[in-house]
């Protein structure tokens, strides 16, 4: 078990991501069944690229719990900004298509319209660049994280 005083921002981010998933899962399942039962229309968006940037703060805002989480972190003396910055940016594309896909998905979530985004589940994002002995070297960007799905 990780003690709060010793937890890194990445460990706190991972724990918070798990709590968020548990928080919305039942509602998501109920809504999905209601959509099916009522034969409501659902938007489906397909894209081979997705460039959403960091999503933690937007997701907390859309769930209506951003202020609650910030207050809780303040009580625990945890720097919320550090945790937000610990989120790995999924670089799953390199241009306009990825940003467009992310904007569509964000709009659906923010407005509450039912929709699903579909794409390829890449193990690695865009490559990372490093300079080694004066030469540029490309390395894989393992965006998946320790849990494989945060």
Model-identified regions with their sequence ranges:
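A conserved ligand/cofactor-binding region detector
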Residues: 1-150
């Amino acid at each position: 078990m990780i003690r709060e005083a010793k937890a890194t921002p990445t460990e706190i981010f991972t724990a918070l991501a798990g709590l968020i998933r548990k928080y919305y899962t039942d509602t998501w399942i109920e809504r999905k069944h209601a959509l099916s039962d009522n034969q409501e229309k659902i938007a489906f968006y397909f894209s081979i690229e997705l460039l959403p940037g960091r999503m933690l703060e937007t997701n907390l805002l859309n769930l209506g719990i951003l202020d609650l989480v910030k207050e809780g972190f303040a009580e625990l003396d945890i720097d919320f900004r550090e945790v937000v910055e610990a989120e790995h940016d999924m670089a799953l594309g390199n241009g306009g298509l990825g940003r467009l896909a992310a904007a569509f998905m964000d709009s659906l979530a923010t407005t509450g319209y039912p929709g699903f985004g579909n794409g390829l589940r890449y193990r690695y994002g865009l490559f990372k660049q490093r300079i080694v002995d004066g030469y540029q070297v490309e390395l894989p960007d393992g965006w998946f994280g320790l849990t494989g799905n945060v």
